[in-house]
């Protein structure tokens, strides 16, 4: 099955604590690049290539969802498909334009008007040619082992290939309103032939069609490791001939600067497939390059290699989970052969940008435009009531009596986490896992006088909260030892100021179909950066109008945490944002 659900809970969407194929390849290229881009979450200006890659892949899958009527030859089938490619090329160009124009931060030296619809059409035609190689082989082999089963109307796969007129597969169907009452039927000319008759060209298209992400399904469609610490999202799965072949689609060509990452990416997918399937081993892996119409083949890992990858990937994930604490250093102290949370890389690996920035190369390194670079070279001064980002407390010890336990229940990211309640005198405070699986033995703690060590202080809905993770500990407190910080004295908000160095907005749909939106930007105070987020109604036009290089001050930002790093949140009622003027005049959002 190319789609599953997390075995131990947690989000179906991307998680900063799970190992993914793209995260792995980034980590292997440059450790600090992974840390800043993936864990800290700092972005760079959007490029046309990033938009193009997504819309082209979606357009190719939209074409393959179609179901042809009777065809006399492969040439007739190809002509039918090329007409669909013409329509999808224009549609993809239009979607790309809208995505580009709605991006808050994009390359100033790029213009969507330079993108040609014909370029989209060429890539789609090349992708179809690679698919037609499968169709031809399917026809030559008389439909493969599943022809007669298909003709009976019974899918040979647990999760069918997405196609027009067929019911889609939702990973969590109980979250979809009125799923069984929906009518997914749609007119199409396809019909199966009688049993034992020769295969027809439209049947070869129907059988050879790979699995891909169904565009009608708003829920994430991923595989999840049985222990929950790795996940992957496949592009295509070819399986018509009884063998499993995993395919990754690339819009460029095999000589691109990121091409070396393809093998690592496919090895990860093959490993994850093997660890999520008792049967149906991977036969091989392929990369389809749409610019050059290339099919690059790779052998599937052996059993010995898969066992070695278990240890390798688990070790990498553990390193990722423990990297960084609190606010993150930027620029780096110096360049190092082993870049990490404090040391920079040499900037030569594909994708390197922020990770190569040091105190000595501010004038040349990094992805900044002229405005942002000038502001960062000027530096940043901090005045009362604001404090440096590096001085925001990240760990506290708090004692009291555990009086209640609950969960797992959704947190503010809609992730299922465990919770409990701590009482000290008249004061009470909620305790919660910092993220799913971060403190699995929370409910094993004795409901007595305890001390919680290395907890992360924060606030949610105006109520103080303690977050616990793998660095935290709960134990019985001895009578003669210090009680730690009093609940009423916990610091749950922060006043900070600095320069906006990155910004982006993300929109999506929850498992139940309800929309969500989040705007995030990164604030730099001259030495450190932190992520600042606003959700839903807290996203104002004033926030959306901010751009990298703007100087701002946040008063009363909520203190939160994401994967052990500070994440400040904007409370629409109590957080004030001040944009810099000569006198730093207050302007509330």
Please give the residue ranges for each predicted region.
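Charged, glycine-rich intrinsically disordered N-terminal tails and low-complexity linkers that flank
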Residues: 1-93, 210-212, 218
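Non-catalytic protein-protein interaction segments used by genome-maintenance enzymes to assemble
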Residues: 184-266, 429, 540-544
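Metal-dependent nuclease catalytic cores in nucleic-acid-processing enzymes
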Residues: 255-289, 450-453, 457, 552, ...
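Metal-dependent nuclease catalytic regions and adjoining charged, substrate-binding loops involved
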Residues: 7-9, 198-202, 206, 212-218, ...
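Short nucleic-acid-contacting surface segments enriched for D/E, G, S/T with interspersed K/R
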Residues: 435-453, 491, 537-555
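OB-fold (S1/OB) nucleic-acid-binding surfaces
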Residues: 393, 403-435, 503-536
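OB-fold nucleic-acid-binding modules
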Residues: 360-410, 461-512, 541, 545-547, ...
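A non-catalytic, helix-rich entry segment at domain boundaries
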Residues: 59-213
């Amino acid at each position: 099955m190319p789609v599953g659900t997390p075995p131990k809970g947690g989000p179906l969407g991307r998680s900063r604590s799970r190992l993914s194929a793209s995260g792995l390849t980034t980590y292997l290229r440059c450790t600090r690049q992974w840390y800043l881009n993936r864990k800290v979450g700092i972005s760079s200006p959007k490029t046309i290539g990033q938009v193009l890659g997504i819309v082209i892949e979606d357009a190719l899958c939209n074409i393959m969802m179609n179901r042809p009527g009777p065809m006399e030859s492969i040439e007739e089938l190809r002509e039918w498909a090329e007409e669909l490619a013409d329509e999808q090329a224009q549609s993809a160009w239009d979607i790309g334009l809208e995505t580009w124009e709605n991006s808050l931060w994009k390359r100033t030296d790029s213009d969507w008007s330079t993108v040609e619809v014909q370029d989209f059409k060429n890539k789609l035609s090349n992708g179809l040619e690679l698919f037609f190689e499968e169709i031809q082989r399917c026809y030559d082999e008389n439909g493969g082992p599943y022809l007669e089963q298909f003709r009976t109307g019974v899918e040979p796969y647990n999760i069918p290939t997405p196609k027009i007129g067929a019911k889609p597969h939702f990973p969590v169907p109980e979250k979809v309103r009125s799923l069984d009452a929906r009518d997914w039927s749609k007119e199409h000319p396809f019909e199966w032939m009688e049993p034992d008759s020769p295969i027809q060209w439209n049947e070869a298209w129907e059988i050879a069609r790979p699995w891909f992400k169904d565009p009608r399904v708003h829920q994430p469609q991923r595989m999840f490791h049985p222990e929950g610490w790795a996940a992957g999202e496949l592009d295509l799965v070819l399986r018509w001939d009884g063998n499993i072949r995993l395919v990754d689609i690339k819009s460029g060509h095999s000589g691109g600067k990121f091409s070396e990452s393809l093998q690592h990416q496919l090895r990860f997918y093959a490993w994850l497939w093997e660890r999520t399937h008792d049967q149906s081993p991977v036969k091989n892996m392929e990369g389809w390059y749409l610019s050059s119409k290339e099919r690059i083949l790779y052998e599937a890992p052996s059993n010995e290699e898969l066992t070695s990858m278990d240890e390798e990937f688990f070790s990498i994930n553990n390193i990722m989970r423990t990297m960084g604490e609190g606010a993150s250093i930027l620029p780096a102290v110096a360049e190092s052969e082993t870049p990490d949370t404090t040391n920079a890389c040499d900037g030569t690996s594909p994708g390197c940008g922020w990770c190569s920035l040091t105190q000595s190369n501010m004038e040349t390194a990094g992805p900044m435009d002229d405005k942002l670079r000038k502001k960062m070279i000027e530096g940043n001064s901090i005045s009362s009531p604001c404090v440096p980002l590096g001085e925001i407390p990240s760990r506290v010890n708090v004692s009291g009596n555990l009086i209640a336990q609950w969960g797992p229940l959704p947190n503010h990211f809609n992730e299922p986490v465990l919770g409990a309640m701590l009482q000290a005198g008249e004061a009470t405070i909620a305790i919660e896992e910092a993220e799913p699986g971060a403190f699995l033995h929370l409910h094993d703690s004795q409901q007595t006088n305890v001390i919680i060590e290395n907890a992360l202080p924060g606030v949610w809905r105006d109520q103080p909260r303690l977050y616990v993770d793998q660095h935290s500990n709960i134990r019985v407190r001895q009578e003669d030892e210090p009680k730690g910080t009093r609940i009423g004295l916990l610091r749950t908000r922060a006043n900070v100021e600095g320069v906006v160095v990155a910004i982006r907005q993300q929109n999506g749909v929850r498992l139940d179909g309800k929309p969500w939106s989040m705007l995030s930007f990164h604030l730099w105070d001259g030495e450190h950066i932190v992520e600042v987020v606003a959700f839903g109604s807290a996203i104002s036009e004033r926030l959306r109008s901010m751009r990298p290089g703007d100087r701002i001050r946040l008063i009363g930002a909520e203190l939160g945490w994401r994967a052990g790093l500070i994440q400040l949140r904007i409370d629409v009622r109590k957080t004030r944002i001040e944009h810099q003027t000569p006198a730093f005049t207050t302007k509330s959002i």
